[in-house]
Structure formats: C-alpha cells, structure tokens
C-alpha cells in the first residue's frame, strides 16, 4: 500500500509539473540551459571584483557547480546508544556500496559519508537498487540521517556539550535539530540527570510536527527535545532551571541558552542542484521577499542568549 501511495504521489507530481512546464521530462533528463537566474546574477557583480574577466571566470565556475547534481550524503548517528548499530552498519554499508559500484568520501569534520552518485541516479539505476534500499532502511532505523554536507557544518562547529541548552530558532525540517540532539547525547546515558536540552522552534505548526517526527527515531533521547511553535522574531524568553542539585538551590535563569542555531529562510538557490526545474521558475523576488524574514531573527537572537 505504501509503495502504491508513493508511486501515485510521484505520478501526480510529474503531471502537475507537466501542466506548468511542457518540456518537464526533457528538463529532468538534460542539463539546465541559460535562464533568468544566470542573467540576474551575472549582471550584479556578485563577486565584487573590478576585473570583469575574473568575475566572468568565477561566475562560470559557480554555474558549473550548480549544474552538477548534488551527491547523496548522510550522517552517522552520534548518540551513544546507537554506537553498536552504527559500527555494524558501517561494515554492511561499505559492502553494499562496493557491490553497487558506488564509492564514498568520509567527511573530516563530522562522521558522515558523501557518495559519488546523486539521489536521482541512486533511486532509478537498477544496478544501485540494493544500496538505495540499504540507505532507506538505515534512515528509518535512525542509524543514519540524510543531510546535505553544508547543513552539517553549523552544528559541527558549535561544540555542544551534555549540559548545554540549545535553541534551534528556525528548525524545520529538523536535520540540524536532530544533529544537535545527538551531540547532546553522545557521551551520556539516557537516564542521566544532566539538564541539557534542545528547543526546536518553527513558525509553521505542520513543520513543527515534521521536526518531532524526524527526531522520533532517537527514542528516549527525545526527552531532551522541546518543539515549539512561535515566530522567530518574537520567541519568548523562557525560564530554565539552573540546576536540580538541592545543595545549589533552585535558581532560575532567563533564556540562558548556551548555543543558538538560526538557519533563517533562504532563497533556495542551492536547490538548483537537486531540482533542475527551478532554473526555469526562478525569479529575483524569491530572495528579495525573504530579506525581512532573514534579518529580524538574526537581530533578535542575541537578546535571548
């Protein structure tokens, strides 16, 4: 039933795209062509260099990267309770990838793999079906988390410790939230009395549910997760207990977060690598309309730190 539902959903999505863009199928199978996106960015001196030739060369390199399909990447679960499963599946994963003629690169700053294949090829190539099914199975079990490499960087740099209070202000779809929660729980047992917590916020209620669902695979570790539904610009400065130690009293501190993640809404230009149809639909207003939404959460975040 699930397979049938997914199949029908994909057909519906394709037909919807087909109605909007007559050559949708051809666009999916061929490299993107010149577009308003390229015209706009090539004229605004994006690289701020007085040498026109250098600017043109840099722009050509940027477009070349954007036209390159985004490699599949995933992060290994770092929560302490998953370490045995992770160790076992790393051996299984290496074997599955080798059998399907797929190579991988171990990232240096986080325990994650980047494959030499993009998502569309991985899913549609018959010779890679076993590797695809293995990735799906390990994602559902919580052993790995599908996440773009760029998305892994912020939390990796925060040096989150077991007693930290972390706020993810614009959290949906929850990949960074889950990464932060795993970092919080990678050196302590589930029943520890430490007060570390991740507060994940999103303005959209449905997206807040997505965050909770994404972290659900972590089981009891989610007792350290609080999902909220507020505007980032006016997130309440909540009070948190400073300690549960009776000898230290019951001091209360206001909004004293040790780490804040603020991944504000973006133009989505990078998704060109995943969805070539965007090349034809892109418009400068997409980014311009988001400017106020990006500005205010960044200005507001220090006030609740």
PLM regions: where:
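S-adenosylmethionine
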Residues: 1-305
